[in-house]
Structure formats: C-alpha cells, structure tokens
C-alpha cells in the first residue's frame, strides 16, 4: 500500500527580538516534505548567529501543544522514540527521523534558547 502522502512536516519558527543587540533568526529548511512511511527524513535549522548547543526541536500536531523531542541540540527527551535524533552546534543543526512512522506526520519546529529579550 502506497503511504506516500504530501504532508507538512516542517514549520518555520522565526525568533526575532527587536531592539536587542543579540537578535537571532532561526530558519528551517526545507519548508515542507513529501515522505513515505519508512523514509529517512532530515530537517535543518540555521541560526543567524552562533548559539552553541542551545537548540530544541518540537513536534506539533493539529489542536495539540508542542511536544519537546530534542534539547541541547542532541539530547533526546525522555519517552521520545530513538528514531529521532539531533545534531549540530554553533549555527547549523539537524533533526533526523531515521524511519518515518505514521504518527510522525506533523509540524516540526526548532527553537533557540541562547538569548531572550
């Protein structure tokens, strides 16, 4: 059975703090992915300036609160399946789903935690 479904897997979270000396923009790519169950999916996130490893990844499904998947760039939150992994530091980060499952079709966000207004 062909499980290929156009799905919005990714979201864009732009963090911009006007008037701050440490404005940080987060840009995800690609903006959307069409994927099948079993596929390896990679999402990238780039910070406009270095944030060390202060990055988290979230999953959100319609009508639900965001769920923390990865914190400190590569640490798996308790209870999150090991098919999710994170890597990177500085400005470039990656979220990988090693084998996409039906329940993984969702929107994914990165969030920096290096600076706040």
Curated annotation (Swiss-Prot):
Q: Where is this region: Complementarity-determining-1?
A: 46-56
Write out the ranges of the annotated region (Framework-3): 79-110
Q: For this UniProt entry, which residues form the secretion signal?
A: 1-22
Main localization category:
secreted
The annotated region (Framework-1) lies at 23-45
CDD domains (alphabetical): IgV_L_kappa
Q: Where in the cell is it found?
A: Secreted; Cell membrane
Cite the entry's keywords alphabetically.
Adaptive immunity, Cell membrane, Disulfide bond, Immunity, Immunoglobulin, Immunoglobulin domain, Membrane, Secreted, Signal
Q: How does it assemble?
A: Immunoglobulins are composed of two identical heavy chains and two identical light chains; disulfide-linked.
The protein depicted here goes by the name Immunoglobulin kappa variable 1-12
């Amino acid at each position: 059975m062909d499980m290929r479904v156009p799905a919005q897997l990714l979201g864009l979270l732009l963090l911009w703090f006007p008037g701050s000396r440490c404005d940080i923009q987060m840009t995800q790519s690609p903006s959307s992915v069409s994927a099948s169950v079993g596929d390896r999916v990679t999402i990238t996130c780039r910070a406009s300036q270095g944030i060390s490893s202060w990055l988290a990844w979230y999953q959100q499904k319609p009508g639900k609160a965001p769920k923390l998947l990865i914190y400190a760039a590569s640490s798996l939150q308790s209870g999150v399946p090991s098919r999710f992994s994170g890597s990177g530091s500085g400005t470039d980060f990656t979220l990988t789903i090693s084998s996409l499952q039906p329940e993984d079709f969702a929107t994914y966000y990165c969030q920096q935690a290096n600076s706040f207004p």
